[in-house]
Regions:
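Conserved short beta-strand edge segments in small beta-sheet-based binding/regulatory domains
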Residues: 32-33, 63-75
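Short proline/glycine- and acidic-rich turn/helix-capping motifs at secondary-structure junctions
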Residues: 38-42, 70-80
């Protein structure tokens, strides 16, 4: 259900809409989905080709964004 190629992240919950808008503006990168919006956990449905660029973009934003592994994200969301 949760692909290893997707980019998982944690950011301040109030910034989830901002992240979604930025990714939407880059049509080819992927689609943002909240894993647990109250905790600021989300992921971008990427391909192997766009995952690296998506990580770089998220880390370049003027807000704190932590890139997580799939396992870390699911554990933080209580979905192990």
């Amino acid at each position: 259900m949760f692909d290893e190629d997707w980019v998982y992240f944690q950011a301040p919950p109030a910034e989830m809409t901002f992240i979604n808008r930025i990714i939407e503006g880059c049509d080819y990168l992927g689609v943002v989905t909240a894993l647990d919006g109250r905790k600021g956990l989300g992921f971008v449905r990427t391909t192997k080709d766009t995952a690296g660029e998506t990580k770089e973009l998220l880390q370049s934003l003027p807000i704190p964004v932590r890139i997580l592994s799939r396992q870390e994200a699911l554990a933080a969301a209580g979905q192990q």
